[in-house]
């Protein structure tokens, strides 16, 4: 009962936000969302938060100064030897216009991380989206 009332209240709040802040058709455009998954450990142990932040400032920000989002996550993966590993992770989410140039910049970020932190892999997921501002 309480959950239903809360759901109705949230739904009403969202509806009122839509009415107050309508998106014009021109505010939306097709874009490409790229999510880059970074494990925060290497063969020596955890990668320090300061090292991660330095990487973001040195590698990610110059390539996408208009903005991106960093999500704190926990990941699980299987290495080449079949062992299951669990580690703290970061996901960098970038939404861009879908040009080959922007995708190349994302690939550069992944390659730099693999090189700098001796990683077997960095996962990149590309999804077509409609972005509205």
Label the model's feature ranges.
Residues 1-4:
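Bacterial N-terminal signal peptides that target proteins for export
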Residues 10-13:
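C-terminal motif of bacterial Sec signal peptides marking the signal peptidase cleavage site
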Residues 15-17:
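Bacterial signal peptide processing site
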Residues 19-26:
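Short, low-complexity, disordered segments immediately C-terminal to signal peptides
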Residues 29-49:
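Terminal, regulation- and interaction-focused segments at domain boundaries
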Residues 54-89, 94-101:
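Mature extracytoplasmic domains of secretory-pathway proteins
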Residues 84-133:
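Helix-rich interaction surfaces within compact, conserved domain-sized segments
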């Amino acid at each position: 009962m309480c959950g239903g009332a809360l759901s109705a209240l949230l739904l009403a709040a969202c509806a009122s936000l839509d009415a107050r802040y309508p998106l014009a058709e021109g505010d939306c455009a097709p874009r490409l969302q790229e999510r880059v998954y970074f494990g925060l450990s290497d063969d020596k142990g955890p990668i320090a938060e300061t090292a991660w932040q330095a990487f973001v400032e040195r590698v990610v920000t110059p390539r996408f100064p208009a903005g991106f989002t960093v999500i704190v996550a926990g990941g699980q993966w299987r290495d080449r030897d079949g062992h299951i590993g669990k580690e703290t992770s970061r996901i960098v989410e970038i939404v861009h216009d879908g040009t080959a140039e922007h995708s190349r910049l994302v690939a550069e970020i992944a390659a730099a991380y693999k090189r700098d932190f001796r990683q077997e892999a960095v996962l990149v997921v590309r999804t077509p989206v409609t972005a509205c501002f």
